């Protein structure tokens, strides 16, 4: 709009106030004067008044015209002010646009700097990524080599493990066969032991009966000894026959004492050998059981001679389910019940039982009995048949020994 109005303007526009007072307007449009009445020249005054009125009317017309011009000028001034304001706003907008352009330029420069920095960082990152990719490839190659090596080693180890397991399976099968054979052998030995124990029990019963018979015979012998002592006392009163009788009695006592000592030593040696053989047999049995139990994870359940379940402990000892008294060997039973008790009692009383007298044997006969009665010796009955065979031979000596002991 300002561009369209600029060519129509001819001169400058005075925007100041046109009139500050009436005096200035009068001075501008014809001057100013003072009125003086004159009595002398009234006509001239009237004429002057008419002329003044005319001039005033003209001046009013001019004033009206000037006011119209002034209004036009004011209107043009207002339009000019509007144009100036519009121009100022346009200038301000242009300045703002220039400032915006500067800001945008600065932002563009900053963005360029950031882009350069980012490109540098990106180049460094690309270099580091390349190094990492290279290292990753190297690690993958090493991993593949390691995997191949492990696969080859695992194959070799698996083959060795399979061979070892097959060998262990064969060993276990052999061990199972050996254990089966050992179990069968142990069952057979248990059956034999059971039969031997039954025979030993029968022999023990026979020995007890023999002991009772020996005690009865001992009582008879004591009665005979008492009778003989009475006769000896009667004969002492007679004279020389008494001295010979005493000498015979002393010789018989000495011989009997020597026989008792030898028989005791023989009996102790036989008992020691019997206990040693039983201990050896028991030790081998325990060792066999412990070796059989060590080959298996589960402890084997075994049966003793009475049919009770027995379990082998870790120390090689056996424990049965039913709590029993500690078992003793047959030799220990015989040595405690048949020999030791009677021997100690008779030695304290100064007497010897008939069973101890009958227990004396010769070494030659014992060697024969070893060949024929080897199994009996384990259970303490090696001398039983010898005692039965020699019982008749010693009846004569028995009377003499009993007589000497009673004296």
From Swiss-Prot:
One Pfam family named in its UniProt record: WEMBL
Record keywords: Coiled coil
Coiled coil feature spans: 72-99, 128-217, 247-278
Superkingdom of the source species: Eukaryota
The family this protein is said to belong to: Belongs to the WEB family.
Protein name per the record: WEB family protein At3g51720
């Amino acid at each position: 709009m300002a561009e369209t109005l600029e060519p129509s303007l001819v001169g400058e526009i005075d925007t100041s106030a046109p009139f500050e007072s009436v005096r200035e307007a009068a001075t501008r449009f014809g001057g100013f004067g003072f009125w003086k009445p004159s009595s002398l020249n009234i006509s001239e005054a009237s004429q002057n008044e008419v002329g003044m009125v005319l001039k005033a009317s003209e001046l009013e017309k001019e004033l009206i015209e000037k006011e119209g011009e002034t209004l036009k000028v004011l209107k043009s001034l207002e339009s000019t002010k509007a144009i100036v304001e519009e121009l100022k706003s346009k200038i301000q907008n242009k300045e703002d646009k220039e400032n915006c352009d500067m800001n945008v330029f600065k932002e563009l420069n900053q963005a360029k700097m950031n882009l350069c920095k980012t490109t540098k960082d990106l180049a460094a990152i690309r270099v580091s990524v390349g190094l990492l990719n290279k290292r990753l490839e190297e690690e993958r190659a090493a991993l593949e080599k390691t995997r191949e090596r492990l696969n080859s080693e695992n194959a070799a180890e698996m083959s060795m493990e399979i061979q070892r397991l097959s060998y262990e399976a064969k060993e276990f099968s052999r061990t199972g066969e050996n254990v089966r054979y050992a179990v069968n052998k142990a069952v057979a030995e248990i059956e034999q032991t059971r039969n031997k124990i039954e025979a030993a029990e029968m022999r023990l019963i026979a020995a007890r009966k023999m002991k009772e018979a020996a005690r009865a015979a001992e009582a008879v012998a004591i009665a005979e000894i008492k009778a003989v002592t009475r006769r000896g006392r009667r004969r002492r009163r007679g004279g020389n026959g008494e001295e010979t009788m005493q000498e015979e009695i002393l010789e018989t006592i000495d011989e009997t004492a020597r026989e008792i000592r030898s028989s005791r030593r023989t009996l102790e040696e036989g008992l020691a050998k019997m206990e040693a053989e039983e201990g050896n047999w028991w030790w081998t049995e325990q060792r066999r059981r412990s070796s059989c139990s060590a080959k298996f994870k589960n402890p084997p359940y075994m049966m003793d001679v009475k049919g009770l379940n027995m379990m082998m402990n870790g120390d090689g000892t056996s424990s049965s389910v039913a709590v029993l008294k500690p078992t003793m060997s047959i030799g220990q039973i015989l040595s405690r019940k048949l020999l030791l008790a009677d021997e100690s009692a008779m030695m304290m009383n100064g007497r010897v039982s008939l069973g101890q007298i009958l227990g004396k044997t010769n070494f030659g006969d014992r060697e024969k009995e070893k060949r024929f009665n080897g199994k009996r010796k384990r259970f303490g009955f090696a001398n039983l048949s010898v005692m039965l065979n020699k019982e008749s031979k010693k009846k004569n000596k028995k009377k003499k020994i009993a007589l000497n002991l009673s004296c």
